[in-house]
C-alpha cells in the first residue's frame, strides 16, 4: 500500500526538496503553500504523514497543528515540523509535533530519521 504525505511550506525550494525525497521513497505526495490551503486539501485526502513549515502566511504551522488536533479525522496524523532556527527563538518547543527538522541542517538526513520516528517504519 502506498503511503500518502502532505507537505506544507511556502518556500517552493523546500517544498520541492521534501516532495522529491518522499516520491523517491514511494510516497504519493500532495502539497500546499500554507495552513489554510492544507486544511482545504485535507477535506479531499487522508495522508499518513503531514510535514509542515512553522512560519507561513495566512496560517502558520502551530495554528495548523491546533486545527488538526481539534478534529477526530485529523488528530492522529503524525506531524513533522519544518523550522528555521529563527522561528524557534522566543517560542516553546512544538510538543504537538512528532518530530522537528531544522531547515538550516541537512534536510534529507533529518527527514529519514523523522519519518522513522513518526511512522515507526523503515524509510
Feature locations, PLM:
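His-Asp phosphorelay/catalytic-motif detector in bacterial-type signaling
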Residues: 46-48, 73-78
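Two-component/phosphorelay signaling modules centered on CheY-like receiver
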Residues: 12-30
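Acidic, metal-coordinating helix/loop segments flanking the phosphotransfer/catalytic sites
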Residues: 31-49, 110
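Hydrophobic/aromatic residues positioned on beta-strands within the core alpha/beta folds
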Residues: 80-82
Amino acid at each position: 500500500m502506498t503511503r500518502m504525505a502532505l507537505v506544507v511550506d511556502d518556500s517552493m525550494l523546500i517544498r520541492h526538496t521534501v516532495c522529491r525525497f518522499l516520491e523517491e521513497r514511494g510516497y504519493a505526495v500532495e502539497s500546499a503553500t500554507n495552513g489554510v490551503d492544507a486544511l482545504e486539501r485535507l477535506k479531499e485526502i487522508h495522508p499518513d504523514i503531514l510535514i509542515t513549515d512553522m512560519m507561513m502566511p495566512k496560517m502558520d504551522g502551530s495554528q495548523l497543528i491546533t486545527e488538526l488536533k481539534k478534529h477526530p479525522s485529523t488528530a492522529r496524523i503524525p506531524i513533522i515540523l519544518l523550522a528555521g532556527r529563527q522561528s524557534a527563538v522566543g517560542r516553546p518547543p512544538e510538543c504537538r509535533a512528532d518530530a522537528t527538522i531544522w531547515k538550516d541542517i541537512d534536510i534529507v538526513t533529518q527527514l529519514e530519521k523523522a519519518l522513522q520516528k513518526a511512522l515507526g517504519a523503515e524509510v
